[in-house]
Amino acid sequence: SLSRVRSIFPHFGIMEQQSGANGWNTRIEAPAPKPGQMTLWAMQSIAHGADYISFFRWRTCTVGTEIYWHGILDYDNRDNRKLKEISTLYNQVQLIRDLAGAEYLASFGILEDYDNLWDADVDVWHRRIEKISKQEIFVAAQLNHTPMDYVLLSDNTEYEELKKYPVLIYPHGLILTERRSVLLKTYVEEGG
């Protein structure tokens, strides 16, 4: 999810956004984006923090494993609806270019840390509740149009990074270091 990508780095790029039907000559097949779908995907990415979007690929290749991975231009190399959509998208993005580099404003954050993520990967009981809890919180936020962040909690996390969130949810934090405990206590004592 783009929310998870944003937790790693707040300003990211989409390297290979789909622009046509796709597939290899050995496996994989998927339909072409419907009219307007490339714009929808691009704007969704921008709304979630992307500062860069690159469409894969410019021109459909005529040989190789990705022969069926269609690009903006088809085999005939002529202008088409996909090129028109990308051109229109470019003009739309120019109107909002000042948003590039803007901070995503989340209403709440879901705290995560590697100790508990790794524990949930190997502990059959922890895994069941960890994954479903986070998934349901994410789905509820999406359905209610409530912007949220995943927030990586480590022993290097500072209070300043947490205080911007009015609400933090730390589902099933079974492993907690002394440093993180003090940090969360400070967050609560300061009104979080």
Predicted regions, residues:
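Carbohydrate-binding surfaces of carbohydrate-active enzymes
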Residues: 1-192
